[in-house]
């Protein structure tokens, strides 16, 4: 583990937390994965949650070595694909909650007012202070298009003289 003391050029590995998503079905799978990870040098703790398919390894280990060792057990494994925030701990109990939360954030930042605003392409202004960067027309520059009233009623079902192609 501390080869750098004996003249090896490798730098020491810092204390790290490695989170993996591992396909485990039973206690036997859990035991096999725990035993394989425990054989690695520098592992302090191994926490396995079979319900969430999550393995958390704490210690002075390289995350690539941990992933390789878990894959050698025959289980499919990948890095935990959901965010970890140390302040909240395991904020997302299950992976599907992360997806639901991210969808809600998108819907909260993009609001729909219920009416369509018409504007000219040349009248955009740059607003970099919004949560979604892009070009938005200012409220004074919005223009209603010129649409003939007869053209709107041409294909109406209420009009007896309407186009009969449809």
Curated annotation (Swiss-Prot):
Domain HMA per the UniProt entry, residue ranges? 15-78
Q: Which residues bind a metal cation?
A: 26, 29
Proregion span(s): 164-166
Gene3D superfamilies registered for this protein in UniProt: 3.30.70.100
Cysteine methyl ester PTM sites in chain numbering: 163
Q: What is the similarity comment for this entry?
A: Belongs to the HIPP family.
* Superkingdom, natural source: Eukaryota
Entries under PANTHER family matching the protein: COPPER TRANSPORT PROTEIN ATOX1-RELATED, HEAVY METAL-ASSOCIATED ISOPRENYLATED PLANT PROTEIN 45
InterPro entries recorded for this chain? Heavy-metal-associated_CS (IPR017969), HMA_dom (IPR006121), HMA_dom_sf (IPR036163)
Phylogenetic lineage:
Eukaryota, Viridiplantae, Streptophyta, Embryophyta, Tracheophyta
Q: Which residues cross the membrane?
A: none
**Annotated signal peptide:** none
What is this protein's function? Heavy-metal-binding protein.
Instruction: Please list the GO terms describing molecular function.
Output: metal ion binding
Q: Which UniProt keywords apply?
A: Lipoprotein, Metal-binding, Methylation, Prenylation
Mind telling me what this protein is named? Heavy metal-associated isoprenylated plant protein 45
Lipidation sites (S-farnesyl cysteine): 163
